[in-house]
Amino acid sequence: MLRAGFLLLVLAFLLAPLSGLLGNGFFWQGGALSPQDWAAIATSLIGGAVAMVVIVLAGTPLALYLARSRGRLVLLAEAVVLMPMLMPTLALGILLAVVYGPSAPLGRVFGALGIALTNTPAAFLLATVYAALPTYVVAARGAIAQVPPDYEELARTLGDTPFRAQLRVTLPLARRGLSAAVSLAWVRALGEFGIILIVAYYPAGMPVQLWTDVQDLGLQAVFPLVGMFLLATLPLPLWLGLRARAV
Protein backbone atom coordinates (compact mmCIF):
# COMPACT_ATOMS: atom_id res chain seq x y z
CA MET A 1 0.00 0.00 0.00
CA LEU A 2 2.79 2.41 0.90
CA ARG A 3 4.61 1.62 -2.33
CA ALA A 4 1.47 2.18 -4.41
CA GLY A 5 0.86 5.50 -2.66
CA PHE A 6 4.41 6.63 -3.35
CA LEU A 7 4.11 5.71 -7.04
CA LEU A 8 0.81 7.59 -7.29
CA LEU A 9 2.44 10.62 -5.68
CA VAL A 10 5.26 10.60 -8.23
CA LEU A 11 2.81 10.22 -11.12
CA ALA A 12 0.66 13.03 -9.74
CA PHE A 13 3.74 15.26 -9.55
CA LEU A 14 4.49 14.58 -13.22
CA LEU A 15 0.88 15.04 -14.27
CA ALA A 16 0.22 18.26 -12.36
CA PRO A 17 1.55 20.71 -15.00
CA LEU A 18 -0.36 18.89 -17.74
CA SER A 19 -3.61 19.44 -15.84
CA GLY A 20 -3.43 23.01 -17.13
CA LEU A 21 -4.42 21.65 -20.53
CA LEU A 22 -7.59 20.17 -19.06
CA GLY A 23 -8.40 23.37 -17.24
CA ASN A 24 -7.92 25.55 -20.30
CA GLY A 25 -8.82 23.08 -23.02
CA PHE A 26 -6.78 22.10 -26.04
CA PHE A 27 -8.35 24.98 -27.95
CA TRP A 28 -8.32 28.49 -26.56
CA GLN A 29 -11.79 30.04 -26.55
CA GLY A 30 -12.83 27.53 -29.22
CA GLY A 31 -10.41 28.96 -31.77
CA ALA A 32 -8.44 26.89 -34.23
CA LEU A 33 -4.71 26.75 -34.75
CA SER A 34 -3.26 29.58 -36.79
CA PRO A 35 -1.60 28.97 -40.17
CA GLN A 36 1.74 29.66 -38.47
CA ASP A 37 0.98 26.95 -35.90
CA TRP A 38 0.16 24.41 -38.61
CA ALA A 39 3.35 25.33 -40.46
CA ALA A 40 5.33 24.83 -37.25
CA ILE A 41 3.75 21.40 -36.74
CA ALA A 42 4.69 20.38 -40.29
CA THR A 43 8.22 21.72 -39.86
CA SER A 44 8.76 19.80 -36.63
CA LEU A 45 7.28 16.52 -37.84
CA ILE A 46 8.99 16.50 -41.24
CA GLY A 47 12.29 17.86 -39.95
CA GLY A 48 12.17 15.55 -36.95
CA ALA A 49 11.49 12.48 -39.11
CA VAL A 50 14.40 13.27 -41.44
CA ALA A 51 16.61 13.99 -38.44
CA MET A 52 15.72 10.63 -36.88
CA VAL A 53 16.81 8.80 -40.03
CA VAL A 54 20.17 10.59 -39.86
CA ILE A 55 20.45 9.99 -36.12
CA VAL A 56 19.79 6.25 -36.32
CA LEU A 57 22.09 5.72 -39.31
CA ALA A 58 24.92 7.75 -37.78
CA GLY A 59 24.36 6.95 -34.12
CA THR A 60 23.96 3.17 -34.23
CA PRO A 61 27.51 2.43 -35.51
CA LEU A 62 28.90 4.84 -32.91
CA ALA A 63 26.88 3.17 -30.16
CA LEU A 64 28.15 -0.25 -31.29
CA TYR A 65 31.72 1.02 -31.19
CA LEU A 66 31.33 2.49 -27.70
CA ALA A 67 29.64 -0.65 -26.38
CA ARG A 68 32.07 -3.16 -27.84
CA SER A 69 35.45 -1.39 -27.73
CA ARG A 70 37.90 -0.55 -24.96
CA GLY A 71 40.75 1.90 -24.56
CA ARG A 72 41.50 5.57 -24.23
CA LEU A 73 40.04 6.42 -27.61
CA VAL A 74 36.69 5.05 -26.45
CA LEU A 75 36.81 7.25 -23.35
CA LEU A 76 37.56 10.25 -25.55
CA ALA A 77 34.67 9.38 -27.86
CA GLU A 78 32.32 9.02 -24.88
CA ALA A 79 33.40 12.43 -23.61
CA VAL A 80 32.68 13.97 -27.02
CA VAL A 81 29.20 12.40 -27.01
CA LEU A 82 28.45 13.60 -23.49
CA MET A 83 29.68 17.18 -23.85
CA PRO A 84 26.67 18.45 -25.84
CA MET A 85 24.37 16.94 -23.20
CA LEU A 86 26.14 18.79 -20.39
CA MET A 87 25.99 22.27 -21.94
CA PRO A 88 23.03 24.68 -21.96
CA THR A 89 21.22 24.44 -25.26
CA LEU A 90 21.41 28.19 -25.86
CA ALA A 91 25.19 27.96 -25.54
CA LEU A 92 25.24 25.09 -28.02
CA GLY A 93 23.19 27.15 -30.45
CA ILE A 94 25.65 30.01 -30.19
CA LEU A 95 28.59 27.65 -30.77
CA LEU A 96 26.89 26.12 -33.81
CA ALA A 97 26.25 29.61 -35.19
CA VAL A 98 29.92 30.46 -34.68
CA VAL A 99 31.02 27.35 -36.57
CA TYR A 100 28.36 27.15 -39.29
CA GLY A 101 27.31 30.80 -39.62
CA PRO A 102 27.65 32.58 -42.99
CA SER A 103 30.89 34.29 -41.96
CA ALA A 104 32.47 31.16 -40.44
CA PRO A 105 34.88 28.98 -42.47
CA LEU A 106 32.53 25.98 -42.56
CA GLY A 107 29.59 28.27 -43.24
CA ARG A 108 31.38 29.76 -46.24
CA VAL A 109 32.20 26.28 -47.55
CA PHE A 110 28.56 25.19 -47.37
CA GLY A 111 27.46 28.57 -48.70
CA ALA A 112 29.61 28.06 -51.78
CA LEU A 113 27.70 24.81 -52.32
CA GLY A 114 24.40 26.65 -52.04
CA ILE A 115 23.61 25.38 -48.53
CA ALA A 116 22.91 28.01 -45.88
CA LEU A 117 23.09 26.66 -42.33
CA THR A 118 21.26 29.46 -40.55
CA ASN A 119 17.49 30.02 -40.67
CA THR A 120 16.85 27.42 -43.37
CA PRO A 121 15.42 23.88 -43.40
CA ALA A 122 19.02 22.60 -43.57
CA ALA A 123 19.84 24.61 -40.44
CA PHE A 124 16.77 23.17 -38.70
CA LEU A 125 17.96 19.66 -39.58
CA LEU A 126 21.49 20.42 -38.37
CA ALA A 127 20.26 21.78 -35.05
CA THR A 128 17.83 18.91 -34.51
CA VAL A 129 20.42 16.22 -35.23
CA TYR A 130 22.98 17.90 -32.98
CA ALA A 131 20.43 18.13 -30.17
CA ALA A 132 19.15 14.55 -30.29
CA LEU A 133 22.09 12.48 -31.55
CA PRO A 134 23.91 12.27 -28.18
CA THR A 135 20.70 11.17 -26.44
CA TYR A 136 20.25 8.34 -28.93
CA VAL A 137 23.88 7.24 -28.77
CA VAL A 138 23.97 7.09 -24.96
CA ALA A 139 20.71 5.13 -24.74
CA ALA A 140 21.61 2.81 -27.64
CA ARG A 141 25.06 2.15 -26.19
CA GLY A 142 23.48 1.01 -22.92
CA ALA A 143 21.08 -1.28 -24.77
CA ILE A 144 23.82 -2.88 -26.87
CA ALA A 145 26.10 -3.32 -23.86
CA GLN A 146 23.42 -5.54 -22.26
CA VAL A 147 23.80 -8.09 -25.08
CA PRO A 148 26.60 -10.57 -24.28
CA PRO A 149 29.33 -10.39 -26.94
CA ASP A 150 29.49 -14.20 -26.92
CA TYR A 151 26.53 -14.27 -29.30
CA GLU A 152 28.46 -12.22 -31.84
CA GLU A 153 31.48 -14.49 -31.51
CA LEU A 154 29.28 -17.55 -32.04
CA ALA A 155 27.79 -16.02 -35.18
CA ARG A 156 31.28 -15.28 -36.49
CA THR A 157 32.32 -18.91 -35.97
CA LEU A 158 29.37 -19.83 -38.19
CA GLY A 159 30.66 -17.66 -41.02
CA ASP A 160 29.23 -14.21 -40.36
CA THR A 161 31.43 -11.16 -40.75
CA PRO A 162 31.63 -8.83 -37.72
CA PHE A 163 29.20 -6.45 -39.44
CA ARG A 164 26.69 -9.19 -40.26
CA ALA A 165 26.95 -10.61 -36.75
CA GLN A 166 26.09 -7.25 -35.24
CA LEU A 167 23.32 -6.64 -37.76
CA ARG A 168 21.71 -10.08 -37.47
CA VAL A 169 22.38 -10.91 -33.81
CA THR A 170 23.29 -7.96 -31.59
CA LEU A 171 20.86 -5.33 -32.84
CA PRO A 172 17.78 -7.62 -32.82
CA LEU A 173 18.60 -8.74 -29.26
CA ALA A 174 18.92 -5.09 -28.22
CA ARG A 175 15.69 -4.04 -29.93
CA ARG A 176 13.84 -3.12 -26.73
CA GLY A 177 16.57 -0.77 -25.58
CA LEU A 178 16.99 0.59 -29.10
CA SER A 179 13.26 1.33 -29.25
CA ALA A 180 13.64 3.32 -26.05
CA ALA A 181 16.63 5.13 -27.55
CA VAL A 182 14.61 6.09 -30.63
CA SER A 183 11.74 7.29 -28.45
CA LEU A 184 14.02 9.46 -26.30
CA ALA A 185 15.74 10.93 -29.35
CA TRP A 186 12.40 11.64 -31.04
CA VAL A 187 11.08 13.52 -28.02
CA ARG A 188 14.38 15.36 -27.66
CA ALA A 189 14.39 16.32 -31.33
CA LEU A 190 10.86 17.68 -31.41
CA GLY A 191 11.17 19.44 -28.07
CA GLU A 192 14.46 21.23 -28.74
CA PHE A 193 14.23 24.99 -28.29
CA GLY A 194 17.54 26.63 -27.39
CA ILE A 195 19.70 25.45 -30.28
CA ILE A 196 16.99 25.99 -32.87
CA LEU A 197 16.16 29.45 -31.51
CA ILE A 198 19.72 30.57 -32.32
CA VAL A 199 20.49 28.61 -35.48
CA ALA A 200 17.12 28.02 -37.15
CA TYR A 201 14.57 30.52 -35.85
CA TYR A 202 12.96 30.23 -39.27
CA PRO A 203 11.33 28.03 -40.39
CA ALA A 204 9.86 27.83 -36.89
CA GLY A 205 9.22 24.45 -35.32
CA MET A 206 6.66 23.89 -32.59
CA PRO A 207 8.81 24.98 -29.60
CA VAL A 208 9.86 28.24 -31.27
CA GLN A 209 6.30 28.90 -32.41
CA LEU A 210 5.09 28.37 -28.85
CA TRP A 211 7.54 31.01 -27.68
CA THR A 212 6.45 33.36 -30.47
CA ASP A 213 2.76 32.88 -29.59
CA VAL A 214 3.47 33.72 -25.95
CA GLN A 215 5.36 36.86 -26.93
CA ASP A 216 2.78 38.07 -29.45
CA LEU A 217 -0.56 36.83 -28.10
CA GLY A 218 -0.09 35.98 -24.44
CA LEU A 219 0.03 32.83 -22.34
CA GLN A 220 -3.51 31.66 -23.09
CA ALA A 221 -2.77 31.52 -26.82
CA VAL A 222 -0.33 28.61 -26.53
CA PHE A 223 -2.76 25.93 -25.36
CA PRO A 224 -3.92 24.81 -28.82
CA LEU A 225 -0.35 24.25 -29.98
CA VAL A 226 0.67 22.59 -26.70
CA GLY A 227 -2.17 20.12 -27.13
CA MET A 228 -1.20 19.41 -30.72
CA PHE A 229 2.43 19.03 -29.67
CA LEU A 230 1.46 16.20 -27.34
CA LEU A 231 -0.80 14.59 -29.94
CA ALA A 232 1.97 14.77 -32.54
CA THR A 233 4.86 13.52 -30.43
CA LEU A 234 3.32 10.78 -28.27
CA PRO A 235 2.22 8.20 -30.89
CA LEU A 236 5.73 7.09 -31.92
CA PRO A 237 7.06 6.45 -28.37
CA LEU A 238 3.83 4.69 -27.39
CA TRP A 239 3.87 2.51 -30.52
CA LEU A 240 7.52 1.59 -30.02
CA GLY A 241 6.85 0.77 -26.38
CA LEU A 242 3.96 -1.52 -27.28
CA ARG A 243 6.02 -3.28 -29.94
CA ALA A 244 8.93 -3.76 -27.52
CA ARG A 245 6.63 -5.37 -24.95
CA ALA A 246 4.96 -7.59 -27.54
CA VAL A 247 8.17 -9.35 -28.64
Over which residues does each language-model region extend?
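Membrane-water interface segments at the C-terminal ends of transmembrane alpha-helices
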Residues: 1-27, 35-145, 169, 173-194, ...
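Short hydrophobic faces within alpha-helices
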Residues: 83, 150-156, 222
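Membrane-helix/interface signature in polytopic inner-membrane proteins
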Residues: 141-152, 162
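Hydrophobic positions on the alpha-helical face of helix-turn-helix-like DNA-binding modules
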Residues: 154-155, 165, 210
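Glycine/proline-centered hinge or cleavage motifs at structural transition points of membrane proteins
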Residues: 158-160, 172
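Extracytoplasmic catalytic/substrate-binding loops of multi-pass membrane glycan-assembly enzymes
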Residues: 203-205
